[in-house]
A protein has these predicted regions:
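Metal-dependent phosphoester/phosphodiester hydrolase catalytic core
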Residues: 1-178
Length: 178
């Protein structure tokens, strides 16, 4: 879903429905916080994760340890950056559901995930035309709606968080010739 006209640095509560059927519990744990205005000095704490799409016990242990560390240090996670290979072994819709979204649901319900496509997602998704399960799972800013310059493609995009500008590139299947 695309959501627009939100205030900067604000908390929004949400529910997910499929038609009339509510898919999320009606409670305040389903919320997210928008980014601060570009150029604003603001603390930033984020995770950078890659090659995590196995869906196995070790993946769950790492996620649990990261969450416990945040709680112990009383840190608010502002961003989750994934550098690819979220859905082993072929990046199918089912693999995304089971090995990424289900596994990281406690974090993803409150934290925006900015993702890049890895080679496993590249087996079923193509950056040149933006088609496939990866592009069904993510709506990436291609018109500079999150800061920076328009890329025209979801395969590479940028976004701002306060004074920090992030650039996300698909290094898997796009032609890189000048």
């Amino acid at each position: 879903a695309r959501i627009s006209n939100l205030n900067s640095n604000s908390i929004y509560y949400y529910s997910v429905f499929d038609g009339e059927k509510r898919l999320t519990p009606k409670d305040s744990s389903y919320h997210f916080k928008t980014h601060p205005k570009p150029g604003t000095k603001s603390p930033l704490y984020f995770w950078v994760v890659g090659d995590s799409g196995t869906g196995g016990e070790n993946q769950a242990k790492v996620h649990t340890a990261m969450r416990k560390y945040n709680q112990f240090k009383n840190l608010e996670l502002n961003l989750y950056i994934h550098v690819g290979d979220m859905a082993y072994s072929s990046g199918t819709d089912g693999e995304f559901s089971e090995r990424f979204f289900k596994m990281y649901e406690p974090t993803l319900r409150n934290t925006v995930c900015w993702a890049a496509m890895g080679n496993h997602e590249g087996k079923t998704s193509k950056g040149e035309n933006g088609i496939g399960p990866y592009y069904d799972a993510y709506i990436c800013p291609k018109a500079a709606e999150a800061g920076g310059l328009p890329s025209g493609k979801e395969a590479y995009y940028s976004f701002d968080y306060g004074k920090v500008h992030f650039i996300v590139l698909d290094s898997h299947d796009l032609d890189r010739r000048p």
